[in-house]
């Protein structure tokens, strides 16, 4: 395996910089932010002041309140040369001319240069990941192919055609933009290590180097069975006339069950070959233009095309599996604290939905 080399902007760690790592959502952002916090002391020895664990600076920027940032820049002791903010909540919020104008002027007025970084993920894996995230959290979401169409064609959805998503930066050539490919084809595949290396921060002395992050179960995909269960659960609850919004923040009930049963090892993948070809074809031209402009290599070198590997669970396929999945759904409904008077009707609707899954002959 020969890793693909690609161009990045030269960043000098001695230059005074206000650095914002803006995610995006579902691109290792929780892992990166958590590990940066864990290494707060090591970053400080490099002259980097990390935003507080309460995300004060990120949250205030998100609310267009620049006072805390102004304070941090003017009060920064001479031991520090960088302020580092890491939050995927800023992903699209800072891609507005007025916001960048404010941040840029604020940085320059205190003798700092503004830098902004993002990880770049191939659209197929991002779509799959965001879809699962929504289903897991019981959000109203169409079928996977329709969700892909919505993202590709609806102007109000996420823009993941990168040249258009980041076009506002063309108005600010003085801002340093760093786009790191979330790719297995590069020499440093760990996102945290790739970011600190790109920021010209040397690995701390000692055998440990950078401290490891805590592994979090928070964003684990509950696997194809967990996605089926979450989706059906929301659908049945809505049919009962119970507001599915009341399930908000309870997605961990199914996620914890999925981890306990090892479902998370059999990941949901919604792409058949036709859909995969359609999505990759849709972004092909803009991806190539983006890769050539920022990395000086072809998109294919960093994100080679792989054949579809669809993995979708469509319901129990045998009588014993049906009994088992129903038993588990009873556990889930208890965990979700669905009102007792609704539970009998819930299982009537659940059983009817499972009946519609055609059992293979001979079961």
Predicted regions, residues:
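Anion-recognition interface
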Residues: 1-363
């Amino acid at each position: 395996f020969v890793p693909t080399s690609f161009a990045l902007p030269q960043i000098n760690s001695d230059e005074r910089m206000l650095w914002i790592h803006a995610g995006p959502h579902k691109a290792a952002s929780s892992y990166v932010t958590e590990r940066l916090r864990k290494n707060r002391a090591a970053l400080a020895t490099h002259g980097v002041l990390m935003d507080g664990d309460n995300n004060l600076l990120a949250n205030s920027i998100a609310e267009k309140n620049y006072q805390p940032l102004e304070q941090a820049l003017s009060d920064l002791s001479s031991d520090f040369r960088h302020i580092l903010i890491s939050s995927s909540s800023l992903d699209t919020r800072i891609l507005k001319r007025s916001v960048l104008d404010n941040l840029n002027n604020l940085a320059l007025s205190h003798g700092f240069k503004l830098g902004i970084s993002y990880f770049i993920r191939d659209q197929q894996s991002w779509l799959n990941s965001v879809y699962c995230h929504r289903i897991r959290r019981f959000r109203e979401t169409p079928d996977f192919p329709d969700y892909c169409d919505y993202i590709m064609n609806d102007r109000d959805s996420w823009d993941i055609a990168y040249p258009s998503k980041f076009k506002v930066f063309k108005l600010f050539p003085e801002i340093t933009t760093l786009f790191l490919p979330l790719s297995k084809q590069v020499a440093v595949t760990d996102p945290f290590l790739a970011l600190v290396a790109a920021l010209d921060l040397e690995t701390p002395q000692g055998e440990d180097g950078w401290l490891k992050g805590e592994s979090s179960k928070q964003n684990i995909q509950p696997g194809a069975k967990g996605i089926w269960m979450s989706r059906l659960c929301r659908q049945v609850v809505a049919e009962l006339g119970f507001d599915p919004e009341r399930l908000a923040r309870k997605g961990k009930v199914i996620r914890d069950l999925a981890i306990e049963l090892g479902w998370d090892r059999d990941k949901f993948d919604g792409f058949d070959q036709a859909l995969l070809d359609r999505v990759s074809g849709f972004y092909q031209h803009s991806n190539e233009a983006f890769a050539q402009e920022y990395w000086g290599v072809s998109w294919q070198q960093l994100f080679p095309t792989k054949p579809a590997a669809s993995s979708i669970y469509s319901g129990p396929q045998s009588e014993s599996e049906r009994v088992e999945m129903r038993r588990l759904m009873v556990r889930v409904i208890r965990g979700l604290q669905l009102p007792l008077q609704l539970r009998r009707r819930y299982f009537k609707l659940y059983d009817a939905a499972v009946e519609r899954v055609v059992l293979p002959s001979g079961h």
